[in-house]
Regions:
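A short, hydrophobic beta-strand element within the central beta-sheet of small alpha/beta folds
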Residues: 85-98, 106
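Short amphipathic alpha-helix used as the core "switch/output" element in two-component signaling
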Residues: 47, 72-87
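Alpha4 helix (beta4-alpha4-beta5 surface) of REC/receiver domains from two-component response regulators
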Residues: 73, 98-113
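Residue-level signal for the "D+5" position in two-component response regulator receiver
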Residues: 38, 66-69, 100
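Conserved acidic segment of CheY-like receiver
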Residues: 7-27
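Acidic, metal-coordinating helix/loop segments flanking the phosphotransfer/catalytic sites
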Residues: 38-59
Length: 143
């Protein structure tokens, strides 16, 4: 996920401290140059979006079952953001639900991928690396 000029920045929106810690360890081992920041709820992600700071990230890993503002609400807000870079940013939904309606709703709202928890770290990082490489190559193109 790391391009020639900078490390990728990944935002994980995850309320489970155990899940967040697992991701910190996995990122440290598999993508040590990537910057991973964790928000424990969807409200924080929406605050960052409202403040215009969500564009600082290159990829969002988004849990669906968050306290307060749910993951689908965050995803809908990202996809309707005023900033085109934010609207197009890759979003990977992470969910314990494999209910077809939940998966379809994620894609209908614009998710780039929907990965069921507990997830295979290999599958997750393959997705992160593929979307990350693509996104970092797109955002570095001249306007």
């Amino acid at each position: 996920m790391t391009p020639r000029d900078r490390a990728g920045r990944v935002l994980l929106v995850e309320d489970s401290e155990g899940g967040a810690q697992l991701m910190r360890i996995a990122f440290g081992e598999r993508l040590p140059d990537a910057v991973l920041e964790v928000f424990a709820d969807g409200e924080r992600a929406l605050d960052e979006l409202d403040a215009g700071r969500l564009a600082e990230w290159d990829l969002v890993l988004l849990d669906l079952n968050l306290p307060g503002v749910k993951g689908h609400e965050v995803l809908a807000a990202v996809r309707s953001a005023a900033d085109e870079r934010v609207r197009r940013m890759p979003v990977v939904v992470l969910s314990h639900s494999e209910v077809v309606d939940d998966v379809l709703r994620s894609y209908d709202l614009g998710a780039n991928s929907h990965i069921a928890k507990p997830h295979s770290l290999d599958a997750l990082f393959e997705t992160v690396e593929t979307l990350g490489r693509y996104w970092l190559s797109v955002v570095s193109l001249p306007n």
